[in-house]
């Protein structure tokens, strides 16, 4: 991803555009800063919140809001589909969407990439960052949530496993 800018675009209440290759909605995109060409990195995203490139592993990780639960941490793979609006561990807040978007629970069984980690109920997932080396070698990413949590992941463990969760007093903090 050298010389590239990565960014994400949510589906902006146009959920089926996340599955259309000719739309930017629901996608992670890269733009080469030298030749200005862009590429679709992945598709099938609902509402991406955080995006980080881990250079030492050549890995992209993202966080994404699900519908009424089903917030996700994803390992992004080039050309892969993450399932929205067909697969999610969340549920619709409005019954009128259930018929045309059944939200199948298994991503893998339906041909999509499974999240590394999902949260039901929702944690209001937000940013994901690589842990700076000055914090030591114990953790590789921090994931924040909209309220009281900061989740850490140990470097030697699978990214989807939360090793430690720090809870903040909700009177004083909202983490983004």
Residue map of PLM features:
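Beta-propeller domain segments
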Residues: 2, 11-175
């Amino acid at each position: 991803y050298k010389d590239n800018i990565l960014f994400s675009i949510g589906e902006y209440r146009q959920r089926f555009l996340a599955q259309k290759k000719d739309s930017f909605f629901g996608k992670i995109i890269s733009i080469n800063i030298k030749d200005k060409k862009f590429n679709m990195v992945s598709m099938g995203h609902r509402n991406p919140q955080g995006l980080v490139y881990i250079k030492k592993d050549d890995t992209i990780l993202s966080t994404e809001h699900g519908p009424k639960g089903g917030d996700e941490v994803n390992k992004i793979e080039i050309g892969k589909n993450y399932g929205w609006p067909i697969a999610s561990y969340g549920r619709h807040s409005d019954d009128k969407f259930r018929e045309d978007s059944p939200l199948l629970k298994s991503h893998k069984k339906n041909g999509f990439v499974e999240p590394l980690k999902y949260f039901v109920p929702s944690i209001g997932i937000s940013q994901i960052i690589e842990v700076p080396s000055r914090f030591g070698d114990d953790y590789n990413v921090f994931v924040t949530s909209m309220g009281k949590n900061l989740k850490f992941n140990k470097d030697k463990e699978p990214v989807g496993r939360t090793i430690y969760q720090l809870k903040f007093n909700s009177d004083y903090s909202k983490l983004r």
